[in-house]
């Protein structure tokens, strides 16, 4: 055997051995692609796709801390010290497209902590379960405040009454409902038609709401009924609603107009009438037959907005409130507010004082 034959034989043996080892090797599978969270911009800022779906989700909310002093302008009582309310408000929105329109949900969880002298928190929504601590002036509460489903213009679940939402509530004021314009949270089935020319209409069947002292929910199969019409344009809007209270078998109505004087200055006016001259009802909760509210907003600077609201009802209550909402940095707003209430006419028989002055400072971080 010569050297050439030896080298060729060794090379052939090495190739055969390498082929056998390659045939026996375990091939590792390709790693699965990582699915990162995708931004969903179809419904506005803050939405992202839930991984593995075509549903968009947004998580938002705020933390706010209110410090109140002086009188309770809702009841006329002296607070005799500082009242404090802390609220964590978490909101979850989902949206996706279907052949019947946008399918959405909205859920709000609210956590309250109240520490005060008067045991009055003086504003809508701060209902909490009392937990006596020392003198009983501390309370906490957790609340599934709102939860509803929407499909196109259809809505079903727990929300605020269309008697409020369709006309646009009241002013950008903390103590905005010293003269109440109706109850708030309710179970409802509603449909809103929105035209392409600024016209919209709503019809709603509602269960009725409740607050600390009263229950306005239906007592049978007949629901409360709300209907409304609205026209909106670049100049502002005009809206009207009519509601039937199936418990007391009475009705109430409101008409509101908003006008944009400039891009920084706007005014609004709202009038209401009820066929039952009592505030103890689901919709017409002002005193007497009628009530009127009005206000303005002036965006003084990019950071500061001035708000003013005044209201008066048939029984003689007058309420005036002013505030300045100042955005210290993006997402953090400080709002000092001063309110005055005059209890005249029939209201003198329900409160101890004729006048009430109160102040509040709100610190709110929105996210």
Curated annotation (Swiss-Prot):
Major location (coarse): membrane
A Gene Ontology BP annotation from the UniProt entry: monoatomic ion transport
Signal sequence, renumbered to the chain: 1-22
Membrane association type: Multi-pass membrane protein
Keyword Zinc-finger: no
Entries under InterPro entries matching the protein: Porin_alphabac
Coiled coil start-end: none
Top-level taxonomic group: Bacteria
GO molecular function: porin activity
Documented effect of changing residue 280 to D: In strain: 019 and 76-250
UniProt keyword annotations, A-Z: Cell outer membrane, Ion transport, Membrane, Porin, Signal, Transmembrane, Transmembrane beta strand, Transport
Family per record: Belongs to the alphaproteobacteria porin family.
Other facts: The pore formed by Omp2a is larger than the one formed by Omp2b. Omp2b pores have optimal permeability to allow growth and protection against harmful compounds. The larger pore formed by Omp2a may be advantageous for intracellular growth, when the bacterium is competing with the host cell for nutrients whose concentration is particularly low within the phagosome.
Role noted for this protein: Forms passive diffusion pores that allow small molecular weight hydrophilic materials across the outer membrane.
Record remark: domains: Consists of 16-stranded beta-barrel sheets, with large surface-exposed loops, that form a transmembrane pore at the center of each barrel. The pore is partially ocluded by a peptide loop that folds into the pore lumen.
Name this polypeptide is given: Porin Omp2b
Organism: Brucella ovis
Lineage: Bacteria, Pseudomonadati, Pseudomonadota, Alphaproteobacteria, Hyphomicrobiales
